[in-house]
């Protein structure tokens, strides 16, 4: 569960390392976001010569959370870190590589690009 002020790792090669959630998108009173949800982020730490700079604001999709996601068969998939992938205004990833596993819950028309770039789909 990600809320405003949550710090996330960035799991792509856009140049960002850490990001902070500044808004959960999808409703005026929505408080929490989980895996597959889109949030607004501010870049808090970035590498030199990356595609994004510190302080810039982007959309991002959450791909891993410590809270995890519950499947219909009763299993729960949890991760050690909270992680996101930076998106442009057309909801396409800025980076060309994804680091670490992603869950099957991202498999819809919007995020098939992320699924295809990921090294492992759980």
From Swiss-Prot:
Any one GO MF annotation of this record: structural constituent of ribosome
GO biological process: translation
Entry keyword Aminoacyl-tRNA synthetase: no
InterPro entries xrefs: Ribosomal_uL14 (IPR000218), Ribosomal_uL14_bac-type (IPR005745), Ribosomal_uL14_CS (IPR019972), Ribosomal_uL14_sf (IPR036853)
GO CC, one annotated term: cytosolic large ribosomal subunit
Pfam families per record: Ribosomal_L14
Keyword list, A-Z: Ribonucleoprotein, Ribosomal protein, RNA-binding, rRNA-binding
Domain of life: Bacteria
Its job: Binds to 23S rRNA. Forms part of two intersubunit bridges in the 70S ribosome.
Entries under HAMAP family matching the protein: Ribosomal_uL14
Subunit structure: Part of the 50S ribosomal subunit. Forms a cluster with proteins L3 and L19. In the 70S ribosome, L14 and L19 interact and together make contacts with the 16S rRNA in bridges B5 and B8.
Stated family: Belongs to the universal ribosomal protein uL14 family.
Protein name: Large ribosomal subunit protein uL14
Organism: Buchnera aphidicola subsp. Baizongia pistaciae (strain Bp)
